[in-house]
């Protein structure tokens, strides 16, 4: 399922992922992916996983397991992407020297998403499929952000199918909390400390705001004004319907 070839394409260092040409956004002379991550051009020798071989098998799997990906909007997104045609996936790097060496070729480093995804089962004592942990917890349910849905709902099931292992029971994809319209992330420096919110507004108010403001699967924009106003409304009108 894996072979050696050469790769060239646009790569997001922040998301650790290559980006298709039709998903590139140009702004001020630079290229970005749909999530706002700047892209750089990469050319290197690479090992590839034959992802294209699993396209039809994945589509059959989605069809026979209609609740595998929720919410439905994310399922439709994944199916549309797979139907558009899967290319073989680069699964090694030579442009840096940190990470796990490819066992048969030490100048190559295993692609981070290949070794990261296997943690779901290696933490359960795999390859010992008879371990209590593996038998109890696999297959499991993954709760992931919408920005990494393809890794979990396309690449990961294909890896598992190739290894003749069960895919996850379900992929649950949540949206983002944004801060003034931007994704909240350490790299952007706009992270909100939940402990500070609790200290300022109280635990129940914070919980209420988070659950009330964003239907599951959608994005929600954080605002201290909104959480304060919501708290005041239900303190002053305790019988008001939620």
List PLM regions with ranges:
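Alpha-helix boundary/capping detector
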Residues: 19-23, 88, 223-224, 232
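N-terminal, positively charged nucleic-acid-binding surface of large information/translation enzymes
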Residues: 1-61, 66-67
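Alpha-helical recognition segments enriched in aromatics with Gly/Pro capping
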Residues: 47-224
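A glycine-rich phosphate-binding loop feature that marks nucleotide/adenosyl-phosphate handling sites
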Residues: 9-16, 175-177, 225-229
């Amino acid at each position: 399922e894996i072979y050696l070839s050469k790769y060239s394409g646009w790569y997001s260092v922040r998301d650790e992922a290559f980006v298709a040409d039709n998903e590139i956004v140009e702004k001020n002379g630079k290229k970005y992916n749909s999530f706002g991550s700047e892209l750089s051009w990469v050319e290197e020798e690479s090992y590839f996983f034959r992802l294209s071989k699993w396209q039809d098998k994945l589509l059959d799997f989605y069809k026979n397991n209609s609740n595998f990906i929720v919410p439905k909007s994310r399922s439709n997104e994944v199916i549309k992407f797979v139907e558009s045609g899967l290319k073989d996936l680069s699964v090694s790097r030579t442009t840096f020297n940190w990470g796990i060496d490819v066992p048969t070729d030490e100048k190559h480093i295993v692609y981070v998403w290949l070794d990261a995804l296997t943690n779901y089962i290696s933490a359960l004592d795999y390859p010992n499929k008879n371990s209590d942990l593996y038998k109890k917890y696999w297959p499991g349910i993954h709760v992931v952000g919408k920005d990494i849905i393809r890794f979990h709902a396309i690449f990961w099931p294909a890896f598992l199918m190739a290894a003749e292992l069960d895919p996850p029971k379900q992929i649950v994809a949540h949206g983002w909390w944004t801060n003034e319209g931007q994704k909240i992330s350490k790299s952007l420096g706009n992270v909100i400390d939940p402990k500070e919110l609790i200290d300022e507004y109280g635990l129940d108010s914070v919980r209420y705001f988070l659950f009330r403001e964003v239907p599951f699967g959608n994005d929600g924009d954080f605002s201290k004004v909104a959480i304060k106003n919501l708290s005041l409304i239900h303190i002053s009108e305790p019988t008001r319907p939620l």
